[in-house]
Structures are given as structure tokens and as C-alpha cells.
Amino acid sequence: MYNYPDERGYFGPFGGKFVPETLMYALEELEEKYRELKSDPEFQKELDYYLREYAGRPTPLYFAEKLTKYVGGAKIYLKREDLLHTGAHKINNTIGQCLLTKRMGKKRVIAETGAGQHGVATATASALFGLECVVYMGEEDAERQALNVFRMKLLGAKVEIVKSGSRTLKDAINEALRDWVTNVESTHYVIGSVVGPHPFPMIVRDFQSVIGRETKEQILQKEGRLPDAIVACVGGGSNAMGIFYPFVEDKGVQLIGVEAGGYGLETGQHAASICGGSVGILHGMKSYFLQDEEGQIQPTHSISAGLDYPGVGPEHALFHEIKRAKYTTATDEEALEGFKLLARTEGIIPALESAHAVIKAVEVARELGKDGIVVINLSGRGDKDMAHVMKHLSLEG
């Protein structure tokens, strides 16, 4: 029986709560309240209502006929998280956590964001539930994603630009944690991925696993059996964990996580924590990180801002360790190829993050052959990446 995290908040050797004493109380309070609400049918009902009526669940599991034909291998299905309100899976988690905030009697939320997607999703849910919202964002990311910064402000959030360190996601998380320590009485920290100290990896996983539960039901309806493989991109890892987790006991289903290979693992310029990192401690958890011998966090690189995190969620670290999932990488070049391929074959423009999964799923489908079934978690749409991709792709015609 797979039963993680344990009562100490560990996923095997990974996870835990490596935080200052001042945050221990907040984490314990959060866990207690969360466990109470998890078994409260009223809370579940409210959550389901907003996911359905506001976010647009369930999302379709779409048979990608043209892509399947092009690849000439297994049948390829797309789990269409890109069709959700705000354009990505992030909203599943922010609606859940903002509801949680209201139930805890808190009036203010803070969040960190890299690509801006989680920031927008948090600002959206905050507007919906009437919460004050502050989003921390690294200066470099804010420049890359100026549109999302404007979106957050439009939704009533205050955007705090972080100018320290590498001015990216890791620094935004550090600032958000500082804010939380100071304002813990009034504020809930909406973490955007399956990372951070316990109970966050568990909470985010639970809110995202609606993806996998729906997928399981839909594929059984369409094919009468489970898929041979599920492919998802992995940064911090919430979209992947969301689709993987409900299949963890189904040993016949291969789970494949695709990390950001950047310019290639051998160059050192990537964001592949499992494939190219080592075990360490950051942001309150023990997991795989990109670090040097002294444990100093290394700069990351990916064409996709949303995969640009120097670590990975502890449950993915466990999945890797117990070989329940296989982790691989796709380079920037390959991601661009996946981006273009899905647009041309299916008329669907994926987020650059999701494009990493698309291109690897093509390989998997070829290996499995005609009798196989592959599901790609299409975690988001590509609108946010247009300006960025225009610099890299020259299109004829």
C-alpha cells in the first residue's frame, strides 16, 4: 500500500519541515485544519462547485488523432488542462487553497510565481473569494512575463518584484516565506507546486489529483482499460503529481516525468533536478536540487519560465527512488519542436512547459507501438509564450 507522506511529513527519506520555529505553529495549524476540511463533505461540495462552474472541470480527455497518425505508434490522448479558466492546471490548486484560507478565517494570501501562471491563478481565486493578495516575483521573470504582471494587477493583486539573488523563482519563494513568518496570523501562503515544507506537497498534490481521477474515469470509458504510459512535464511537479498520483497503485501504467533539459544536461544549463541534481535541503524540504559541492543552489536555465525551478517536489524524489516513475529530459530545442508539432497536427498551441511532455510522448508512443495508449498531461496553453517563442522560431509561409 502506498501511504505517503508519513505522520512526520516525509515521503520516504524526502520532504519534512525544515523551517524556523516561528513557522512550525503555522504549518501544524494548516495541517490540522486541512485534515479536518478534507473529510468535510461541505468543503468538498463547495470545492467541486467552483472547479466545475468557475474553472471548467471536468476537462476533456481528447484523442489526438492527427498526432497519433503522424507518430505512427500508440494512440495519444491529451488531458486538456489548457482549457481551464486562466489557461493552466494551476487554478485547481489556488481555488482549493483560497477556500482553505477562508475556512481558516484569514483575509490575506501571498504567493510566489515564476512564469506568472500561479500568480495569475492565485490573484484570480483571491478576486473570486474577496481575499487580499500579494504575489512575489523575481525581477528577471517579471521582465520575461510582463503581460502576466499586468494581469495580476488587473485582478487586484499587489506584485512585489524581487531584486535579490538570481531574481527568479527561488528568490521569490524566499521572500514569500519571509512575509509569511512576519504575518502568519493573518496570512496564508499559497504555494504553487508540490514543494516546500509539509503539509504543502500533500495539499497541492491532493488538490491537483482531480486531474488523474478524471483521466482514469475517462480513459476507462473510452478504451475500457488504463493507459500504458502517462507523460507530464516536471518543474516543481504539481501537474505531473496531479495526474500520476491516482495511478500510483496501477503498476501497469508507466509514469514518465519530463524535466527541462535546457541546452543539454552536459552543459550544466538546464533545470533537471532529478536527472542532473543531487539530494539537499531548500525551501523547507529535503529533495533533489541543482547545487554545487557546497550545497549552493546553481542557476537554472529553461526556455520555459515555469520549469525554471532548481528543485523538485519530495514525492517525485520518492517516485524516482522507488522507481515508480521514470524521469527524463527534453531540451529547449525539443520543446520548441513539440510546440510546433502540436500546433500543426492538432491546432492546439501548448504551453512551452507542456511541449516538453509532448515531444517525449512522441518517443514513448513510437516505442509502445500500435497497440499502446499514451496520455499526455497538457498542463497549459501557449498564449503566454508567444512573444518568447517568436524570438526562437522563424516560420515560413
UniProtKB/Swiss-Prot annotation:
- Do you know which SUPFAM superfamilies this protein is assigned to? Tryptophan synthase beta subunit-like PLP-dependent enzymes
Enumerate the cofactors the protein uses: pyridoxal 5'-phosphate
Q: Which reaction does it catalyse?
A: (1S,2R)-1-C-(indol-3-yl)glycerol 3-phosphate + L-serine = D-glyceraldehyde 3-phosphate + L-tryptophan + H2O
Q: Could you tell me which pathway this protein works in?
A: Amino-acid biosynthesis; L-tryptophan biosynthesis; L-tryptophan from chorismate: step 5/5
Entry-linked CDD domains: Trp-synth_B (cd06446)
Biological process according to GO: L-tryptophan biosynthetic process
Highest taxon above the source species: Bacteria
Q: Supply the InterPro entries for this chain.
A: Trp_synth_b_CS, Trp_synth_beta, Trp_synth_beta/beta-like, TrpB-like_PALP, TrpB-like_PALP_sf
Residue(s) carrying N6-(pyridoxal phosphate)lysine: 90
GO MF entry, a single one: tryptophan synthase activity
| EC number annotated for this UniProt entry | 4.2.1.20
Task: Provide one Gene Ontology cellular component.
Answer: cytoplasm
Show the Pfam families listed in the entry: PALP (PF00291)
Q: Any idea which UniProt keywords this protein has?
A: Amino-acid biosynthesis, Aromatic amino acid biosynthesis, Lyase, Pyridoxal phosphate, Tryptophan biosynthesis
Say which family it is in.
Belongs to the TrpB family.
**Function according to Swiss-Prot or TrEMBL:** The beta subunit is responsible for the synthesis of L-tryptophan from indole and L-serine.
Task: Spell out the subunit comment.
Answer: Tetramer of two alpha and two beta chains.
**What's the protein called, per UniProt?**
Tryptophan synthase beta chain 1
* Gene it is expressed from: trpB1
